[in-house]
Regions:
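Transmembrane-lumen/periplasm boundary regions of multi-pass, lipid-linked membrane glycan transferases
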Residues: 39-45, 179, 183, 188-306, ...
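Transmembrane-helix signature of polytopic, membrane-embedded enzymes
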Residues: 7-13, 104-127
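Transmembrane signal-anchor helices characteristic of membrane glycosylation enzymes that use polyprenol
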Residues: 6-36, 222-238
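Extracytosolic helix-loop segments that constitute the early lumenal/periplasmic catalytic or substrate-binding loops
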Residues: 20-24, 38-62, 69-72, 76, ...
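Short acidic/glycine- and proline-prone juxtamembrane loop motifs at membrane-interface regions
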Residues: 86-89, 133-144, 185
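Transmembrane-helix motifs of polytopic, lipid-linked glycan transferases
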Residues: 91-112, 150
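Membrane-embedded architecture of ER/inner-membrane glycosylation machinery
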Residues: 171, 299-443
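Membrane-interface transmembrane helices that cradle and orient dolichyl/undecaprenyl
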Residues: 110-115, 151-170, 180, 350-354
Length: 443
């Protein structure tokens, strides 16, 4: 056993993780994506108009940049704009993220037979920087990841009952995928149904006749139902032609156009190459990137002895990677829905993973904490913007930074505590970042 994960570790890191996701949730400088600002603008304008549809915007070309579900959620959470705060806009995103973590916990705990493993999977996923960056702000990613993941969690949780279900599971999966499409894009039905097809095919022991006769209609039913839910946007919007032009043609079809001179050259070189897609997908793990790499290496070494669940998780990752390597715009953000699967793999291999991935994570955390402390200390001692005392930290901030630094150092030199501290260190770094940026809030 290499650094087993105890309930004491789990409870401490769980409390730390919950605190981390709510700490600074209303900050203007929280890690996020630039899409949040136009999304907030659409919510405000639509709420002021007093109607759910059409979506409103004063910015050219972004009125129908995304389906309406996330904007409707923003309208509800802010009380039609009456409670216009970042916290009111963002807390539904955190709720979606925590629900995804909860159902990931249930699925992994069920098929592994260990609640510690399930809890570890949820905590690892929450520790990924991409989860923290995209799972807190007012963005489309939290509901998209939740609704896309739910059917796959159900297959892992119920196993045979879900795979053999002739109608109930396909109907529920279709509704879940439909909600995901209504949150992000109809394009996600392609990787989702491709992954489901691979799941069914493997369940039938790679027999093409069996999967065609027993499961093909299920995948078709799921796809049709999901697209039907998405099509409600066209039915309810008084200007469906604008939705078609701005969203279907502008936002989605344009992603297949070559970014430079040649689609196939873009595929193998440059910033939108398939290699960059692989790299940015790994980088979604943030400080745990090398832990993820060591997990994939371990899975390759044990490829002849993989369990059913491990194979299904890898098939899910491969399906999304293959599909999203086809558009000319390739980004690891498109593969956020498979990060829970990769977190589950890390949790399942946790006790067998080598130390080097965790030690690199701890060294990266040490660098982050040292950089934040150095920059913050210099700003506090300097006359920021020509006025002394503007950039000030409390003793609590420096006490927290000292504690975090000491804990990470302990993890580097203690083999027994290395893995658990590396996981906790991710959340400590996020808290340190938020605390270090607090003077920008004017407090």
């Amino acid at each position: 056993m290499r650094g087993s994960f105890t309930y004491r570790n789990a409870i401490f890191i769980l409390l730390l993780g919950v605190f981390t996701y709510f700490y600074g949730l209303d900050s203007r400088f929280a890690p996020k994506n630039g899409d949040e600002y136009p999304y907030m603008h659409i919510v405000r304008m639509t709420a002021d108009a007093g109607a759910w549809l059409p979506l409103q915007s004063e910015m050219d070309g972004i009125k129908n940049t995304k389906p309406p579900l996330v904007f409707w959620e923003g309208i509800v959470s802010t009380g039609w704009g009456s409670d216009w705060t970042l916290f009111a806009l963002r807390w539904p995103s955190v709720l979606y993220t925590f629900l995804t973590a909860f159902f990931l916990f249930l699925a992994v705990a069920r098929y592994s037979g260990k609640k510690q493993t399930g809890l570890l999977a949820a905590l690892v996923w929450l520790s990924f920087f991409a989860t923290y960056r995209y799972g807190r702000p007012f963005l489309t990613d939290p509901p998209e990841v939740f609704w896309l993941s739910l059917p796959f969690f159900a297959l892992l949780y119920w196993g045979r009952a879900a795979f053999e279900s002739k109608l109930l599971f396909p109907l529920l999966a279709g509704l879940c995928f439909g909600m995901a499409l209504l949150s992000k894009s109809f394009a996600y039905i392609v990787p989702a149904t491709f992954a489901l097809g691979l799941f069914y095919w493997h369940w039938r022991e790679w027999s093409i006749p069996k999967v065609l006769l027993q499961d093909l209609y299920k995948v078709i039913l799921i796809a049709v139902l999901a697209l039907g839910v998405f099509a409600l946007w066209f039915v309810l919007d008084p200007f469906p032609e604008a939705v078609w032009k701005e969203f279907v043609l502008g936002e989605n079809a344009g992603k297949f156009e070559a970014r430079s001179s040649n689609y196939f050259l873009d595929l193998v070189r440059g910033g939108d190459s398939i290699w960059m897609l692989a790299l940015t997908t790994l980088a979604n793990a943030g400080l745990f990137t090398f832990v993820l790499i060591s997990t994939l290496i371990q899975a390759w070494r044990e490829r002849r002895f993989l369990s059913l669940e491990e194979i299904l998780l890898l098939l899910l990752v491969c399906a999304f990677f293959i599909v999203f390597s086809l558009p000319s715009q390739r980004s690891g953000r498109y593969l956020l829905p498979v990060m829970p699967a990769l977190a589950a793999l890390i949790a399942m291999y946790w006790d067998r993973l080598p130390w080097w991935g965790f030690r690199i994570a701890l060294l990266l955390q040490l660098v982050v904490l040292a950089a934040l402390a150095w920059v913050g200390g210099n700003l506090q001692l300097s006359n920021f913007l020509g006025q002394p005392g503007i950039w000030n930290y409390s003793f609590l901030h420096w006490g927290f930074m000292t504690f975090s630094f000491a804990l990470v150092l302990l993890g580097i030199f203690s083999r027994e505590r290395c893995k658990a501290i590396a996981l906790a260190g991710c959340f400590l770094c996020y808290c340190a970042l938020t605390s270090s940026l607090s003077p920008l809030e004017g407090s």
